[in-house]
């Protein structure tokens, strides 16, 4: 499975595991339980670190689809983050009883437009920041060209 397939697949186990845990859990506990209870997820995903070619830092590839699945579920109103590191089911998630495909379709219908909006906002902010840097640079160039009369 590619990353986006993993992300879509993880949504239902996340919801089901939170239901088993009483509707609320820490992210770490939830991740461990999802991996332990799902037969399609290899248990070594929580110990198989890779090294980033660009930074040299170690990371867990499983964290990417897991965290994006969580964020999409939050965007779709299925989960809440009452405090940092804690996830909580919403009524919408507690009432969901469909398939993984039905869940991911429902979630992506809401979250994909939100991702697009975020992306556009980030692009605009990046352009604005670049323009500010260019103005500041040109002001420095002008200042460097001025000679003081003594």
Question: Each predicted region: which residue ranges?
Answer:
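Acidic-basic catalytic patches of nuclease active cores, encompassing PD-(D/E)XK
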Residues: 148-150
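Short, hydrophobic-biased segments on the C-terminal half of alpha helices
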Residues: 70-71
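Short helix-capping/hinge SLiMs at alpha-helix to coil transitions
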Residues: 18-23, 36-40, 82-83
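Positively charged, polyanion-binding regions of nucleic-acid-associated proteins
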Residues: 2-28
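Short, amphipathic alpha-helical interaction segments positioned at domain boundaries
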Residues: 94-139
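Minor-groove-contacting beta-hairpin "wing" of winged helix-turn-helix DNA-binding domains
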Residues: 85-90
